[in-house]
Amino acid sequence: LGGETAEMAGFYASGDYDVAGFAVGIVDRKNLITGEKITAGDVILGLPSTGIHSNGYSLVRRIISDNHLTLKETYEGFDKPLGEVVLTPTKLYPKLVLPVLKGADVKGLVHITGGGFYDNIPRILPEGTRAVLDADKWPLLPIFSFIKVQGGVEPREMYRTFNCGLGMLLILSRGEAEKAKKILKNIGEAVYEVGTISEGNRDVIVTGGLFHE
């Protein structure tokens, strides 16, 4: 079992309090996806996010405050006001992932939440492997370029803090990855082949994307 309490520095005033909820999941031990079967040559598929999801808001609020940005203004690159962009609801993935689990052998699943790519992916990697991602392989949502420029955030820190356009990663062998792509296409979900597993030391390499800017 695991859990956390969100750190919301500068958000709560004296006398405020937080009401939190939780969910408990159950899985048969034989169906656990532990990542232990991941090997060099496996493929990494990515499912798109809808925005910043539920992580990085303290940094976003600081950038908005420091740059005197207006939540009601529609800035260049957006089709709606900034306030609506940052509050875009978090995408949920169970209805997309469950059909894949039934039709393909998924070796690893990674939810890109707090800690981004660099902290979340190693949790599923076995010893002797490395995840190599090409950020040019998936669309970068405008909000992430906006945050990087307005906040002067280094690319590596962006990929450590935010999902940068991908909310869920699936790791499969080449043949099983093709099955997964077909399943996701049939249910109308976009999916991108964003990287591979190579030999390494349970680390992550990201190239392209925000590193170009």
What are these regions (language model features)?
Residues Y12-Y17, L71, E76-L87, K91-E213:
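Glycine-/charge-enriched secondary-structure boundary and capping motifs
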Residues L1-S58, T196, G209-L210:
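Glycine-rich anion-binding loops of enzyme active sites
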Residues I38-E84:
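Acidic, glycine-rich loop-and-beta core segments that form the ion-binding/anion-interacting portion
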